[in-house]
Structure formats: structure tokens, C-alpha cells
Amino acid sequence: MGPLWLDVAGYELSAEDREILQHPTVGGVILFGRNYHDNQQLLALNKAIRQAAKRPILIGVDQEGGRVQRFREGFSRIPPAQYYARAENGVELAEQGGWLMAAELIAHDVDLSFAPVLDMGFACKAIGNRAFGEDVQTVLKHSSAFLRGMKAVGMATTGKHFPGHGAVIADSHLETPYDERETIAQDMAIFRAQIEAGVLDAMMPAHVVYPHYDAQPASGSSYWLKQVLREELGFKGIVFSDDLSMEGAAVMGGPVERSHQALVAGCDMILMCNKREAAVEVLDNLPIMVVPQATALLKKQQFSYSELKRLDRWQQASANMQRLIEQFSV
């Protein structure tokens, strides 16, 4: 599979989608709420994506929970990460949440949810209650449980947004945030610990500039991705860019420049979403590349949604997540 992830417009593939998915540089499709009508339609869409690609291809979605849950009707509701630490049995619930989220996606032939968020603190507009906590130990304890749940059912894990997005106020979807702190050691401690624990299969860097360290956003910085992530922290998994169509990546230039910089800096796979013309421009201008190690991120189990819903574990987890949402939602 190639390095580029892109999106499709609707519930079914268009003729253009089918053609573009055969391009050797395409390695993944990220789905959005607009791609989901019901459970059977989603299964049919994912089957069509895999058939059109004619080779292994990754299918992913942002389904971490709370406001970032693309598939809702017909799926269990997953709470925002912040809620787990507020509950008495929060660690147990976080593991159930990770398992439930991953299991329901796998039952619909989705390989990945880009999760969990390992950022610390609730102040950032882009992160907020997507964070597990405001201190290192709270984030580590509950994210570790969430990761265990994901892995137990066969889904690869993605830590984000390296080296820490939680302390900036600005939203990288809308602008390039600058983290002016002289040290981000506390934020980094979370990523370091999870890398050392061997529980992260992939990493997604932030579209954030940390000027005391490097002038480029982490997503396009060889300092962060090669020197720190690979060499200092010893991370061996796949590195995804965040969506390069976000305004946070604009400091790297146009679509082709952003993609080239991210790949040269150390990203293995890049996301270009919601701008088909930009994705086509990237495909037309990037050299043909393959990322054979990315096949390790394909889902490890296969089962139907009806089989899953018969499990006591599913019934308990789904009910517990709903109760947690009702308990803490204002």
C-alpha cells in the first residue's frame, strides 16, 4: 500500500473513487459521518473500497468518543475521554470504552480508529474533553486502559497528537498554533511512557509549532519525527500526518509541498481529506511510494455485528458507556 490516505464523498463509491483507489500511492481511506447511513450500507461501502483497491488498503475513522464520533445511529455512544477519570471505576470503564469502540468498528470492516488522544489538559479548543486528564498520571492510567481494550479485540492503536497538543488554545483545524513554552517535558512523558510500554502501533504528530525546539510544525519536522520520536524515544511504529488540508499545516505550503515535507520529515503515511482536487494534485506529483509495514495496522479479527451484540461483554460495555454519558453530560 502507498502512503496517501484520502476520503470519498458519500454512501457509495463514484466511478472516480474506484479509479483513484487503484492508484499505487493510495494506502488508506478515512471515513466521515457523511459516509454512514446505516450498518449494512457501511459494510457494503467498505467491501467496495477493498474491491476497488485490488490490494490491501486501510480503512479508518475518527471514532474516539464524545464530539468526535463519526458513526452514531446504530452504534453505541462512546463518552469523551475526560469522563472516565470522573467515574469511581474509571480505569475499568476506559478499558471497556476502548474495547467497545474498536469492536463495533471491526464488525463493520473498519481497521482503525485514530485513537487515543494522549494530549494533556482541557484548555485547547481542538482537544478539550477529548483529553483523559490534566496531569500525567491521570492521562497515563486511563489511556493505558483504553489502549488495552482496543488491543484486546484486535485493533491497532494510534497515539496523538505528538508531542502534545493540549496546552495551546488555538485550534489547528483553523490556524497554526504556537506552543511558546520552554519545555514540554510533562506532555512528552505520556508519549514516552506509552512507547516504552510497547502499546502504540502508530503515532500522529500535531500541526503545532514549538518554537523553542524547532521552527516547523511537528507534523513536518524532522527534529520531532526523526531525532526525538525515532532516535530518542525509539518508536518503531507507523507515523501518520494529521490531515494536511487543515489550516494548521498551511505554513508548509500547498498540498504537494505539505505532503513532501511531511514525508521527508518522517511521516510514513499522510492524510489529505475533504479536498479531492488537493489529493489528486498530490497523487500526480508525488513519486510512487509503498509502505509495506503499514499492513501491520490491518484489523486482526473478523466477526459480524450480530455476533458481537450477542456477547455479554458488549451488552455490559454499551450500557455502561450510556450511563457514563448520562451521568456527566450537562
From Swiss-Prot:
SUPFAM superfamilies for the chain: (Trans)glycosidases
MF terms in GO: beta-N-acetylhexosaminidase activity
InterPro entries per record: Beta_hexosaminidase_bac, Glyco_hydro_3_AS, Glyco_hydro_3_N, Glyco_hydro_3_N_sf, Glycoside_hydrolase_SF, NagZ_Beta-hexosaminidase
Pathway: Cell wall biogenesis; peptidoglycan recycling
Top-level taxon of origin: Bacteria
GO cellular component terms, semicolon-separated: cytoplasm
EC nos: 3.2.1.52
A Pfam family of this chain: Glyco_hydro_3
UniProt-listed PROSITE patterns: GLYCOSYL_HYDROL_F3
Compartment(s) of residence: Cytoplasm
Disulfide pairings: none
Catalytic activity: Hydrolysis of terminal non-reducing N-acetyl-D-hexosamine residues in N-acetyl-beta-D-hexosaminides
Site feature: Important for catalytic activity: D171
Keywords recorded for this protein, A-Z: Cell cycle, Cell division, Cell shape, Cell wall biogenesis/degradation, Cytoplasm, Glycosidase, Hydrolase, Peptidoglycan synthesis
GO BP annotation list: carbohydrate metabolic process; cell division; cell wall organization; peptidoglycan biosynthetic process; peptidoglycan turnover; regulation of cell shape
Binding-site list for substrate: D62, R70, R130, K160, H161
Record: active site: H173, D242
Entry-linked PANTHER family: BETA-HEXOSAMINIDASE, BETA-HEXOSAMINIDASE-RELATED
Family the entry assigns: Belongs to the glycosyl hydrolase 3 family. NagZ subfamily.
Role summary: Plays a role in peptidoglycan recycling by cleaving the terminal beta-1,4-linked N-acetylglucosamine (GlcNAc) from peptide-linked peptidoglycan fragments, giving rise to free GlcNAc, anhydro-N-acetylmuramic acid and anhydro-N-acetylmuramic acid-linked peptides.
Protein name: Beta-hexosaminidase
Lineage: Bacteria, Pseudomonadati, Pseudomonadota, Gammaproteobacteria, Vibrionales
